[in-house]
Amino acid sequence: MTALLVIIYLSFAGLGLPNSVLGSIWPQMQLDLGAKVSLVGYLSMTVTAGTVVSSVLADRIVRRFGVAKVTVVSALMTGCALLGFALSPGVPGLFLCALPMGLAAGVTDVALNNFVALHYEAKHMSWLHCFWGIGASVGPVIVAASLRAGGSWRMGCGLISAVEGALCVLLVCTISLWNRASGSAGSLQGSAPAARAASIFRRKGAMPLLCGFALYNAMEATAGLWGATFVHDSFGISTSDAALTSTLYFGALTVGRIAAGFAASRRSDRQLIRTGMAVSALGMLLTWLAGSAWLAMGGIFLIGLGFAPMYPAMLHATPSYFGAELSQQVMGVEMAFAYVGSTCFPPLFGALAAPLGTSIYPGFLLACLLLAAAAIELADRLFSAREFCGKGEKQII
């Protein structure tokens, strides 16, 4: 299944490719379309709304059509949405394209994560999310290159749309690999959902685990969005120097996930999560107590490094908590909670920072980490305490 694994990695890079494009093109897009600066927030919320809806419905969709077809159609939808952005004459067209972009992202995210969790070792889950980070990093580079070449944001969107189109063609040409893998490992395609989505919430340990997903993604998004502002406001360095904070943070996430992939063969999911919590807590304390901008940036680097193994390990543990039959459905709900956390908490921090100042940044993150640790540990104890319903599966977290 090595060839298929490469396709999955490329698909996840394609999933990350448009993720940071909106922020990259918005300064020029806003001027060209005469839109309000704040409109980008509503566009982002539209994408997120589509992602949450399709995450919850992903189990039914994938069971009906299979992972391969879902991934192909999602790549096609993403490419068409980006092309729509490039050709849009005004703001209404942007909103029409934002929704299908979100719908495509959510179902693909669930389908690929569940496929890897069921069929591959834990290290591949970490590397999968590393490729998402690579895709998210390449998107703005493509936009910047098109702008430097004298093009516009429309050209940047068109180029990324072409990349998604090429990925779609590649997926169509390799669809037989997916069919063979699903057949050999046992496919859920064509089967009915194992349980109603609402029943997941009644399972012992489910709610603490879902809260852990929301809180983790709240931390990751808040740390990335507000880190540079915190360093700039606290130490008075230039905006160009402060911008390095974001590079260090996201670089740490990417490098950390590569390293976590190698560590996953020797460490359980539980150990990876706890190690990540400890390293990120150390980074938060260093950021809080730092006497210089560079120490604070080093602390934020450690925060990203600590976060790196946590989310992939939490997702990889889902089949061992709920069983292969339920894992895809549960993963959809987990990701819906994750998206809600990453959408709501950065604005919440902004609302608190307005009267209190961005100096609350490390304390805010540490409070979220303590709550996330409590929720995840409680879930682990509750799942470990009851007899597991899966057959032939051992607990790996």
Question: Would you name each region that the model predicts?
Answer:
Residues 22-23, 204-247, 251-254:
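Extracytoplasmic gate region of multi-pass secondary transporters
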Residues 29-30, 61-62, 142-151, 231-232, ...:
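Interfacial helix-cap and linker-helix signal at transmembrane-aqueous boundaries
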Residues 34, 66, 87-92, 236, ...:
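Helix-breaking motifs and short loop linkers at transmembrane-helix boundaries and internal kinks
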Residues 53-92:
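Conserved MFS/SLC helix-loop-helix module at the cytosolic interface between two early adjacent transmembrane helices
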Residues 97-131:
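Cytoplasmic helix-loop-helix junction between adjacent transmembrane helices
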Residues 321-358:
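A late C-terminal transmembrane helix in Major Facilitator Superfamily
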